[in-house]
């Protein structure tokens, strides 16, 4: 392709498209240019993402005029080109200096909110929820589903594909001896990842693997050496935290197979079975090579052998799979541990394509998804389409200013926030409900993977602004699931319809109430409210004590109190006065566990006595708390900061304590007993300074956290990504505002990292088209707000209301190197 044509292909057009002859106005006769474009609209700005040129006569040149670059950022790069999928892609505990590891993201390919995540997997066992860690030296295969940034042993990693040559291995093998299995060492220098594309060279087989994705499927291209016995093999039993317990595969025609993989708690998975994940993945696959030499391997296990993680990683399990029986050319097979392979000769550099669609509903659903998204065979076109989807999604926020690394961190963070909650429907609108029956709807997209304890804090407040329809979908998914499964309550950590019970609290309530208060109401409000009230009543404080005794009593009392307050706020908005009074009173539960003698929150027993105070005092991790200590958890009274300050001894004392909390924090922000940005309980704390009349400290510390806790590197996330939460915090804080208390419409203001942040508003939920945050005098050491204007008028508040944002307009900050202790003080 000539240079000008390749340039045209990637230009983003914001105005009319003009096509004319280079001698326009002089030539005689007809000159033809056929220009075909796929158009999509971003806030009424036309974007051309793919241009096919067919020049019918020599001497004809197509030139396009453009008015705006709507999917390009500073420097002419597409927004998707700023994404670095390796940020956070490690589970390494030594790097993290804690057992919880670092980001735990995956480096493979996904589309925004897509059902599939096509990614390399380096490990099956351990606390490696994404199935991948960068420092691992071998790859087991490439799966079609993954979880992003989670702990607790993970799940998915289904349909593990591996291109191989030579003898057939039915077991994955061990990392220390990869030659004894189908896994392979790989060339780290060859490993490449970007939005829409992943590639690596498997050195044991001299095969180059390339991956891309569609919303319901994945495309893999393998480049082989010359070999009489090249192969694609698929471990149908594989699962990140265990195994599927039953599988089925059948040959459809000379190029296609289909089947399913049944995953239950008996096979480990989410929480090693404790998360109660129970699902079936259906697949439909077409190969570019005919199925001539193919077969299925089937392993049998000793009677009584379990199928959970400890069994799957045992020598006995490995030996049973190594001895698997191989059946050649079966029409179909079903069993407890199956794998499929197809073999073929290849010449040097020969490429073999494999296209797969999945469904959680049925075989027919998988085939329908395939026909809708995977008809073509052009691998590059699939890559470009995936990148184009990310260009569109990432253009919800456009930034200028900052360094190249900061822009990469920003757009990678935004990318990570748009993986979940993923679409759980087929293209037909069908999905499996909480009653295990198939339902169909076009009213909303059924969504799944809700890491509630994490994402109510920043992730969903962010999506309320930039993707309110996704939030509306999620709320409909909450409501229908609670109705379908007959519980009438919301789950705190939902995974593929499973109520896993992971963590604590009632975060779905906060998500729904925050959305309702911000005008997102496309669901049955009365039913949603009824389920919220039932959730708070059934899953919360001890009904007679009014607090949670023992165990994780500090975390439970504080968090359940906040969620009760959320119900009270919603009741008040719905004119349910009696309910409002009840739940607002329950929101004061924090007062019942504050020990005046210790000056802090303390575990209280059921008889009203205090539990023993630990030797480390409020720095004792797990004392009454979930994944934190009382010093960290104790700041969580976001709905009544003034009441919290009162019982803690007043503003001056609290402010001094809060400053000490941050000053004792290690600057790399890895797991620590003070401001532990590596975990969620403290994510609101930097914004407390605004409420304490010291907004310049919010400005200072958010800038420090953005600079030191986030990096354009493998260790660029100081803690688990947690399904978008860690990244969403960065997006909001670096843009200059973040909520302290979801359920309120107030956002706390701080100093933006970037010179300009432009947020595209959804006109279905907003009056304005865009909200822009701009800065003057911005620099790495100029983090203090000197003054501000909102739509040209002086603005002296350290907060802004949601209504001011969705109305559209511009918030302008003048920044300086010294604090202005008069601006924004309440």
Spans of model-derived segments:
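Ser/Thr/Pro/Gly-rich low-complexity, intrinsically disordered segments
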Residues: 8, 19-23, 82
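Bacterial Sec-dependent N-terminal signal peptides
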Residues: 1-4, 22-75
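Accessory carbohydrate-recognition regions in carbohydrate-active enzymes
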Residues: 74-558, 566, 571-592, 598-601, ...
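Beta-strand-rich recognition domains
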Residues: 771-777
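ATP-dependent phospho-/nucleotidyl transfer catalytic cores
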Residues: 563
């Amino acid at each position: 392709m000539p240079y000008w044509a390749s340039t045209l292909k990637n230009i983003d057009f914001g105005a009319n498209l003009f096509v004319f002859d280079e001698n326009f106005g002089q030539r005689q006769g007809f000159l033809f240019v056929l220009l075909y474009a796929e158009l999509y609209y971003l806030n009424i700005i036309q974007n051309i993402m793919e241009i096919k040129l067919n020049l019918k006569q020599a001497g004809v040149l197509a030139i396009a005029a453009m008015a705006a670059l709507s999917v390009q950022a500073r420097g002419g790069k597409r927004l998707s080109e700023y994404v670095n999928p390796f940020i956070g892609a490690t589970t390494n505990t030594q790097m993290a200096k804690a057992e919880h590891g670092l980001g735990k993201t995956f480096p493979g390919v996904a589309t925004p909110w897509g059902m599939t995540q096509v990614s390399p997997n380096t490990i099956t066992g351990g606390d490696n929820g994404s199935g991948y860690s960068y420092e691992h030296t071998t790859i087991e295969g490439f799966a079609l589903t993954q979880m992003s940034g989670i702990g607790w042993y993970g799940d998915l990693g289904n349909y593990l594909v591996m291109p191989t040559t030579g003898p057939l291995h039915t077991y994955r093998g061990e990392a220390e001896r990869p030659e004894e299995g189908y896994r392979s060492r790989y060339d780290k220098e060859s490993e490449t990842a970007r939005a829409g594309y992943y590639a690596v060279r498997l050195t044991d087989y001299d095969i180059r693997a390339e991956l891309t994705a569609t919303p319901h499927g994945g495309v893999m291209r393998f480049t082989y050496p010359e070999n009489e016995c090249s192969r694609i093999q698929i471990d149908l039993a594989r699962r990140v935290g265990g195994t599927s317990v039953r599988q089925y595969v059948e040959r459809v025609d000379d190029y296609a197979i289909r089947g399913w993989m049944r995953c239950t708690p008996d096979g480990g998975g989410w929480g090693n079975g404790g998360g109660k994940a129970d699902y079936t993945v259906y697949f439909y696959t077409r190969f570019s090579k005919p199925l001539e030499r193919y077969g299925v391997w089937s392993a049998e296990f000793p009677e009584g052998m379990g199928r959970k993680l400890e069994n799957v990683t045992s020598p006995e399990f490995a030996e049973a799979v190594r001895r698997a029986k191989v059946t050649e050319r079966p029409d179909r097979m079903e069993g407890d541990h199956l794998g499929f392979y197809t073999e073929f000769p290849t010449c040097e550099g020969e490429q073999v394509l494999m296209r797969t669609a999945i469904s959680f509903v049925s075989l027919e659903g998988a085939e329908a998804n395939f026909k809708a998204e995977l008809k073509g065979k052009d691998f590059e076109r699939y890559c470009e389409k995936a990148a184009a989807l990310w260009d569109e999604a990432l253009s919800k926020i456009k930034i200028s200013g900052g360094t190249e690394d900061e822009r990469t961190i920003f757009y990678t963070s935004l990318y990570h926030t748009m993986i979940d909650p993923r679409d759980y429907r087929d293209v037909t609108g069908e999905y499996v409900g909480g009653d295990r029956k198939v339902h169909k709807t076009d009213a909303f997209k059924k969504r799944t993977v809700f890491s509630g304890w994490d994402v109510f804090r920043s992730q969903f407040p962010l999506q309320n602004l930039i993707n309110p329809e996704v939030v509306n979908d999620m709320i409909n998914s909450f409501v229908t699931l609670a109705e379908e499964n007959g519980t009438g309550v919301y789950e705190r950590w939902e995974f593929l319809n499973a109520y896993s019970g992971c963590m604590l609290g009632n975060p779905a309530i906060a998500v729904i109430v925050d959305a309702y208060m911000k005008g997102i109401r496309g669901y049955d409000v009365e039913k949603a409210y009824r389920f919220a009230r039932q959730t708070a009543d059934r899953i919360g404080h001890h009904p007679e004590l009014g607090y949670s005794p023992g165990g994780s009593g500090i975390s439970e009392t504080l968090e359940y109190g906040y969620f009760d307050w959320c119900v009270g706020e919603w009741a008040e908005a719905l004119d349910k006065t009696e309910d409002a009074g009840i739940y607002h009173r329950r929101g004061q539960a924090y007062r019942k566990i504050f020990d005046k003698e210790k000056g802090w929150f303390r575990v209280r027993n059921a008889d009203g006595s205090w539990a023993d105070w630990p030797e480390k005092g409020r720095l004792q991790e797990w004392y009454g708390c979930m994944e934190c200590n009382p010093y960290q958890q104790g700041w969580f009274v976001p709905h009544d900061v003034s009441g919290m300050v009162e019982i803690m001894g007043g503003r001056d004392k609290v402010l001094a304590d809060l400053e000490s909390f941050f000053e004792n924090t290690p600057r790399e922000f890895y797991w620590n007993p003070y401001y532990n940005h590596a975990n969620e309980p403290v994510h609101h704390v930097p914004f407390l300074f605004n409420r304490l009349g010291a907004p310049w400290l919010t400005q200072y510390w958010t800038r420090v956290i953005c600079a030191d806790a986030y990096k354009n590197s493998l260790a660029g996330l100081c803690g688990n990504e947690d399904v978008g939460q860690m990244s969403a915090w960065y997006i909001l804080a670096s843009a200059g505002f973040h909520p302290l208390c979801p359920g309120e419409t107030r956002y706390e203001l701080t100093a933006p990292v970037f010179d300009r942040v432009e947020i595209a508003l959804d006109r279905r939920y907003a009056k304005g088209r865009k909200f822009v945050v701009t800065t003057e005098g911005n620099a790495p050491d100029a983090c203090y707000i000197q003054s501000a204007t909102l739509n040209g008028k002086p603005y002296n508040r350290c907060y802004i209301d949601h209504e001011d944002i969705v109305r559209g307009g511009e918030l302008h900050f003048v920044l300086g190197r010294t604090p202005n202790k008069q601006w924004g003080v309440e």
